[in-house]
């Protein structure tokens, strides 16, 4: 029961932390240069947090306070809002990276993690916009309170023994980069499809929570190339008939393609590299950037 609860708590927090979502809202209506600055900040924060934070010595209360205070002050003078934006992105990136590592290390239940993500994303929908700060805080509070006990549990400590890079001095070069080539090609294909879909389909600015829910799917895999082919059909159908249903179908197939990459990557790299969680987190952040920024 404890594993089930901890898995749900991890999912609840992962669904609440979407790096760049609230920061993009702060930059709406600003110049393209400002939005490019957001992308650069996201990239820098990912590189700075990569490999640095050990889950055993991490305290989420610091990032919880930064995220909460940042979300309470969305309308600030330009200079001050830029500082808040940088702090918010860095904390979101660091928190989500730790969560991704913990999900990989712990003997967690994938359906429980996915359920937590769905619950969190549901309450982040537009119908609850007036309570977004409160909902984010409520989603992050359980992991903030429970985290200390979680990393001292026998399951976490046993899982950690499989991740040699954190237990001795090693480098990211121990990860077999050759196995990532296939995933990278598939990811770039779906990334391109998502970009094309944003250009040609009617995709209004929204939370895209349905898409993010599908991306986090853990129940079944779909061949990436089949998903891309179905997405092309959805784009062409949407151009001819201009029905919003095709946008939903497009998001569903592209999302399933991304989730298939992440599921395969997770099963192939789990127990081999401590950085597998970081790679999954990096892929997710790239998907979020493509969906929320640009076209």
Curated annotation (Swiss-Prot):
Q: Where does the record say this protein resides?
A: Membrane
- What is the predominant subcellular site recorded for this chain? membrane
Segments crossing the lipid bilayer: 4-24, 31-51, 66-86, 103-123, 183-203, 218-238, 243-263, 274-294
**Membrane topology type:** Multi-pass membrane protein
Q: Looking at the record's lineage, which domain of life comes first?
A: Viruses
Pfam families for this protein: Herpes_U26
Keyword annotations for this protein? Answer: Membrane, Transmembrane, Transmembrane helix
- What are the record's GO terms for cellular component? membrane
Family annotation (InterPro entries): Herpes_U26
Its protein name is Protein U26
The record lists the organism as Human herpesvirus 6A (strain Uganda-1102)
